[in-house]
Amino acid sequence: PGVLRLTGAAKEDIPMYRIQTMNKISPVGLNRFPSELYEVGDAVQDPQGILVRSAKLLDLEFNPGLLAIARAGVGVNNIPLDRCAAAGIPVFSTPGANANAVKELVICAMLMGSRDIPGAIRWVREQAASGADVSTVVEKGKSAFIGPELYKKTLGIIGLGAIGSIVANTAISLGMDVYGYDPFLSVDTALRLDRHVHVVKDINDLYKRSDYITMHIHYTEKTAHMINASAIAAMKRGVRVINLARGEIVDDEAMLTALDTGMVAAYITDFPNNRLLTAPHVIAMPHLGASTPESEQNCAAMAVDTLRDYLESGNIRSSVNLPEMTMDRSGVQRLCVLHKNVPGMLANITSLFGRDGVNVENLSNKSRGDYAYTMVDLGSKVGDNVIEDVRRTANVCLLYTSDA
């Protein structure tokens, strides 16, 4: 178990936080670190926080003082989540920070898939390269690129989170009929959805209705090859499938077979590979979903803010491996305890404060899987003996304390 003590008595008494950057992070985000409180850079040693984009941390040996990792982006396949949770290290991501960039690319993907715009551009260039008078051949050749409009077509969206929800609302504004599937739909997201979006409980209802299907879900063991031969067989013939989520969500062999038979009219993906690039009716891009300056800036700013909020106040926002919990400050001292999610832990912890005659001003506790997080604001400071007793309590992974 580790202990981080912050005095908070005066600015000069607060130790500098050390933040290591594992990738180039936008200055828009880095400038949100107060220079008097934070040392930030790629050469920082023994960091208390790590900022990362795509660098692989799977085999990284964490220093004992590491308290948190923030990913400036959404996917966290490059971070060992279970190992971090066991060590009491929350991993933060930035859901929604790149949502608009991805949304715009989804609309672009539907248009490209409908009218084969990349193929049309390629054809024009081929005509010019062959010496043809392009101005005279285009009228005859353009008929090969006729495709449907989006208006009054049906879009199916798998995953109605930060990205899927704004894709849905934008598609409604384009005159599309929208069906969404998300078994984990939150109340907040549901309230943001346009009232004309149809939310279905059975994904097959979405498959059979949709002219276009787009996925906005995390890659997990359960979502691996979610779009397989069985799923494709349930879809409307001639569907156009867009995958800007993760390549592994789609079974490439099943998709290629469906493209060959015409079951799928086009597959537009942000995750190219050599096999896909040789197939007709595939539009493959080099993972451009979040590749806008605005998106990179938003992700960096959100990553820095969540990291600071945890280090300075113990609040956990947008964590992918530990309970989500925030609590307004009250009292004189705050203790945050990450522990195993087992019976009796809350009673064990609070009894130690009562034994020392310290009143609990506010308390919150939440669990996620095998772990739970307890935040306690106390009416007076506890002695070092109490802090040490909490730290040594069985099943405690991390104890964080700071003064108000």
Stretches with model-predicted labels:
Residues 58-60, 183-276, 291:
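Rossmann-like adenosine-cofactor binding region
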Residues 237-329, 373:
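Rossmann-like dinucleotide-binding domain for NAD(H)/NADP(H)
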